[in-house]
Regions:
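Intrinsically disordered, low-complexity Pro/Gly/Ser/Thr-rich segments with frequent PxxP/GP/PP motifs
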Residues: 108-113, 510-525, 529
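Solvent-exposed beta-hairpin/edge-strand motifs
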Residues: 14, 18-22, 493-505
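Conserved, mostly hydrophobic/aromatic
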Residues: 114, 157, 189, 219, ...
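Carbohydrate-binding surface patches
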Residues: 58-60, 413, 417-420, 425, ...
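Solvent-exposed beta-strand/loop surfaces of large extracellular or lumenal domains
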Residues: 90-99, 500-516
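Carbohydrate-recognition beta-sandwich/jelly-roll modules
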Residues: 1-187
Length: 544
C-alpha cells in the first residue's frame, strides 16, 4: 500500500518494490511482453526458458519461475509472482544474484495528494527438489481468488477453423447431424464469428434465417448444448452503440477525442446495462449455455476512463462480472485473448495459447504455450484451442483454413490434445473426414481431465516428456519429438518396468530407464507397470 503525501497531482506509470532474495537463479521460466495496449500476461505472450549468466536479469508479466540455489542449499525450484489481480496488471523481474522487482503498472493513472494505492498480492515461494513448482503457484492463485475449475471437461464442435466468417445455419446443422451419426461423446455445438450483423450489433445476419433462438432450440433437441461467440470489447464504426452512444460510452484520448478504435468504457453505467442485456438475451432468451468471449486484451484502453482510478484491468473485470451476472448459472464462459491470471474466478474456461492455425509450425507454438501453462488448470479449465484432423485432401471451397499437416503430425496433434487435459473442440467439416479420422478422434475418449505434467520443464524449450500420473494401476506418459530431425526421448524409473507403446502396439521391458528413438514430429503414449498383466485394463483409447 502506498499513500501519496506531499505529492503533486501527476500521472504515474508504475509502482515498483525492489529487493534481494536469498537465491542464485540458474534457469528462469517466464513470458515475454507483447503490445496489447496493456502490459498483461495473455494467451499470445511468448514463453521463455533462459539460462542465467552472472548478474543477468529477466523480466516478464505476472510471474517468473526459477531453478537454482537457495542460500547454501542447491537444487531448489521456486517462483515470484502475483496471485491476485484486482487493481493493476503486474510484472516481475529476477536476476541471477537474487535481485528482484515486483511492479504494478499504473498506466499513467492520475495520482492525487492523499490517494491510497493498493497493489495486488505478490508471492515468493521456493522448495527443494520438486520441479512442479508452478502447480503450487496455480494453487495459490486458486486460493487467493476462491477460483476452482468446475467438474468435467467441455467438448464439442466449433465452426471457426473450417468456415471462419463464412459460417451458415446450414453448415451448423449439417455438422450436428454427423456428430449424432458418429455418436461422438461431445456436448457442445459452438457457433463462432460470422453469425452476427457486425461486431457491436449482436443480432443474426441473413445467413441464419431461422434466427439464433430457433437454432439453439434445434441444437438442444438434437441432444447437444448450443454455444456462441461474442466480442464485448470490439465495436465496428457502423454498430448501434458507436452511432448512438459514441460520445458517452467510449474512451477518449489525450486530445479529448473518442479513440478511433472505439474502446468501450464499462465504468459507464449505461454501457454495463447494455452488456447485461446482451448476456441475458443470449443465455436466458435464446438458450445458449456456452459463450466464447473474444477480442479482449487488444481493446482494453490503458486510461482515459470516466471514473477516476479506473483502468484496463478494472474494465476487464467489470465486463466479466457483468456478463457472469447476466447469464444463467449453468452457462459456461470461455475467455479468449484475455489476461491469464485476472480471469481467475470469473470464467469457466481460459484459452492459454495462440490460435492453432493450419501448419505444423503453429502447432509447435501452441504446444509450447499450453504445456508451459499447465498450472492454470488449478484455478480454471484450460483451453488449448481446437483440434483439426483433416488432411490436405479433405477440404472444399468452404474451407477458411487449408491445413497442411500430414498423418504423423495430425496424430501428434491428437496426442498433444490428450496431454493438454483441457477442453476439446473439433473444428473440421465432418462430412469430408474418413473413417480413419473419426477413429483417431475417438482415442481421446474418455477425456483426460487434468494436464499431464512436464518432466523436462526446465530442460527443454517445448516440454517433450509428460506424465499423466497413474490410471487404473498403470502409469501413463506422453513423449513428443517437436524437432525436424530424429531424436531420443527418455523416461527414468526407480526400478524395472514393463512398458506398452500405444501407437507402436508392442510391449517391452525397461530396467530403470527407457529410451525411445523418435522420428521428426512424432509422438507416443507409453504405459508402465510392474507386470504385463496390468495392461489388460488398456483399450483402444489413450486413457485406460
Amino acid at each position: 500500500m502506498f499513500t501519496a503525501k506531499d505529492f503533486k497531482t501527476r500521472r504515474c506509470n508504475f509502482l515498483s518494490i525492489d529487493g534481494v532474495l536469498p537465491v542464485r537463479a540458474k534457469t528462469a521460466i517466464f513470458n515475454d511482453y507483447i503490445y496489447t495496449r496493456v502490459l498483461d500476461l495473455e494467451m499470445q505472450s511468448p514463453p521463455r526458458n533462459a539460462a542465467l549468466m552472472k548478474d543477468q536479469k529477466e523480466s516478464g508479466p505476472q510471474y517468473i519461475a526459477f531453478q537454482g540455489d537457495f542460500g547454501e542449499k542447491r537444487g531448489y525450484y521456486g517462483y515470484l509472482g502475483f496471485t491476485t489481480f484486482n487493481r493493476f496488471f503486474g510484472g516481475v523481474s529476477l536476476s541471477e544474484n537474487g535481485e528482484f522487482s515486483a511492479c504494478a503498472y499504473l498506466d499513467f493513472e492520475e495520482i492525487r495528494p492523499g490517494d491510497v494505492i493498493r497493489t495486488d498480492n505478490c508471492c515468493f515461494y521456493a522448495q527443494y527438489g520438486n520441479k512442479d513448482v508452478l502447480s503450487i503457484y496455480g494453487k495459490h492463485i486458486a486460493k487467493d481468488n476462491r477460483a476452482y475449475p468446475k467438474a468435467g471437461v467441455p467438448s464439442g464442435w466449433c465452426s471457426w477453423y473450417y468456415y471462419g466468417g463464412k459460417v451458415t445455419q446450414e453448415s451448423i446443422l449439417e455438422n450436428m447431424e454427423i456428430l449424432k451419426r458418429e455418436k461422438l461423446p461431445v456436448k457442445y455445438i459452438q457457433i463462432d464469428a460470422g453469425w452476427q450483423v457486425r461486431n457491436g450489433d449482436w443480432e443474426e445476419n441473413s445467413k441464419f434465417p431461422m434466427g439464433m433462438k430457433a437454432l439453439a432450440a434445434d441444437i438442444k433437441e438434437a441432444g447437444f448444448i448450443p454455444g456462441i461467440w461474442i466480442a464485448p470489447f470490439h465495436f465496428e464504426k457502423e454498430s448501434k452503440p458507436v452511432k448512438e452512444h459514441g460520445n458517452d460510452w467510449f474512451v477518449r484520448n489525450d486530445d479529448g477525442e473518442v479513440d478511433p478504435s472505439y474502446l468501450i468504457d464499462y465504468s459507464v453505467k449505461e454501457a454495463r446495462e447494455w452488456l447485461f442485456e446482451l448476456g441475458r438475451k443470449i443465455s436466458v432468451e435464446w438458450g445458449y449455455r456456452y459463450i466464447k468471449v473474444d477480442l479482449i486484451s487488444g481493446y482494453l484502453a490503458i486510461n482515459g476512463y470516466k471514473k477516476h482510478g479506473f483502468n484496463g484491468l478494472n474494465n476487464f473485470c467489470t465486463m466479466m462480472r457483468t456478463l457472469r451476472s447476466a447469464v444463467t448459472e449453468d452457462t459456461m464462459l470461455l475467455s479468449c485473448t484475455s489476461p491469464l491470471g485476472a480471469l481467475a474466478g470469473y470464467a469457466d474456461c481460459l484459452r492459454v495459447s495462440d490460435d492453432i492455425f493450419e501448419k505444423w509450425s503453429s502447432l509447435k507454438i501452441v504446444a509450447k504455450q499450453v504445456l508451459r501453462r499447465y498450472f492454470t488448470a488449478e484455478y480454471i479449465r484450460l483451453d488449448p484451442d481446437c483440434l483439426m484432423v483433416r488432411l490436405p485432401s479433405q477440404h472444399d471451397s468452404e474451407a477458411f483454413r487449408f491445413c497442411t499437416r500430414n498423418e504423423r503430425e495430425i496424430r501428434t496433434f491428437v496426442t498433444f490434445m490428450s496431454a493438454a487435459g483441457g477442453t476439446l473442440m473439433l473444428s473440421d467439416k465432418l462430412s469430408l473426414l474418413d473413417r480413419k479420422a473419426f477413429d483417431l478422434i475417438k482415442v481421446l475418449f474418455p477425456l483426460n481431465e487434468k494436464p499431464a505434467k512436464p518432466l523436462d520443464f526446465f530442460e527443454r524449450d517445448i516440454p517433450s516428456v509428460l506424465s499423466y500420473g497413474e490410471h487404473k494401476g498403470v502409469e501413463v506418459y506422453a513423449l513428443f519429438n517437436w524437432e525436424d530431425v530424429q531424436e531420443v526421448r527418455e523416461i527414468n524409473f526407480k526400478g524395472p518396468k514393463y512398458l506398452k507403446l500405444f501407437y507402436a502396439n508392442k510391449i517391452v521391458r525397461a530396467d530403470g530407464k527407457f529410451a525411445l528413438e523418435m522420428s521428426a514430429h512424432d509422438s507416443e503414449i507409453v504405459y508402465a507397470a510392474n507386470d504385463a498383466e496390468s495392461f489388460e485394463v488398456l483399450t483402444t483409447s489413450i486413457l485406460p
